[in-house]
Amino acid sequence: MKQYIKLIKKIIRVGNQKKDRTGTGTLSIFGYNMKFDLKKGFPLLTTKKCHIASIIYELLWFLKGDTNIAYLNENKISIWNNWANESGDVGPIYGKQWRNWSTPEGHEIDQIKNVLIQLKKNPDSRRMLVSSWNVGDIDKMRLPPCHVLFQFYVFNNTLSCQLYQRSCDVFLGLPFNIASYSILIHMIAQQCDLKVGDFLWTGGDVHLYNNHIELAKKQILRIPRTLPKLTILKKPQSLFQYCFEDFKIIGYHPYPAIKGEISI
């Protein structure tokens, strides 16, 4: 994950000191791109240990179309607790928009299913996109989507995906985002009998929170290790039938975790 270390170094070197919604303050740059060849390994950060269970369960939660943290909490995942209301709901965020996008006419659109149909019937389509940024629902969301739009591309029977992320917490959030979408590419490739290609990541406001800067400086002193491999142990009948036990990470030997405070 040399790309990630390079990004941190750039933010520290040329970032702009900005105020932010949480009051913490950030060191920020605008516009950044990274590319990960999934054939060369699973891009799970090695310069600090990542909690892979949180990454997988969150992705499965999104794919269920769920917006209540009960499923996450049942599986001992607490990453969304700070944004849930008393009933455990976080509003119409990722899962709702991916699986049940509401139209002005009162219809619901399953964007993920539509992409799967296109990948199988018309893989050269330029319309294989999923958006989480439903303007009419933003005010109902406890936390508006940070990773807002992703698009699929097929060539030579190989599946690639590009993500646009409007706001990126580089120290805490970005390692999760990279791993999560890489897993999703593996899952969809398996379902559509495709090979995995590239994951391309584009960030808008890409930042280190001020209380993470010293932690990030510690992290960039660590030399990235060999990437692990992701194996999916079985092929369910549909994309929506995977469970946590279907995924195996092989050869993950990270440095110890570096804990940072979440800005809410």
Curated annotation (Swiss-Prot):
Active site positions: 146 (nucleophile)
Pfam families: Thymidylat_synt (PF00303)
Keyword Isomerase applies: no
SUPFAM superfamilies associated with the record: Thymidylate synthase/dCMP hydroxymethylase (SSF55831)
Keywords of the record: Cytoplasm, Methyltransferase, Nucleotide biosynthesis, Transferase
Any one GO CC term of the record: cytosol
Pathway where it operates: Pyrimidine metabolism; dTTP biosynthesis
Location relative to the cell: Cytoplasm
Gene Ontology MF term list: thymidylate synthase activity
Superkingdom, taxonomy of origin: Bacteria
Example GO BP: methylation
Annotated transmembrane regions: none
HAMAP family: Thymidy_synth_bact
Role of this protein: Catalyzes the reductive methylation of 2'-deoxyuridine-5'-monophosphate (dUMP) to 2'-deoxythymidine-5'-monophosphate (dTMP) while utilizing 5,10-methylenetetrahydrofolate (mTHF) as the methyl donor and reductant in the reaction, yielding dihydrofolate (DHF) as a by-product. This enzymatic reaction provides an intracellular de novo source of dTMP, an essential precursor for DNA biosynthesis.
The protein's name: Thymidylate synthase
Biological source species: Buchnera aphidicola subsp. Acyrthosiphon pisum (strain Tuc7)
Lineage: Bacteria, Pseudomonadati, Pseudomonadota, Gammaproteobacteria, Enterobacterales
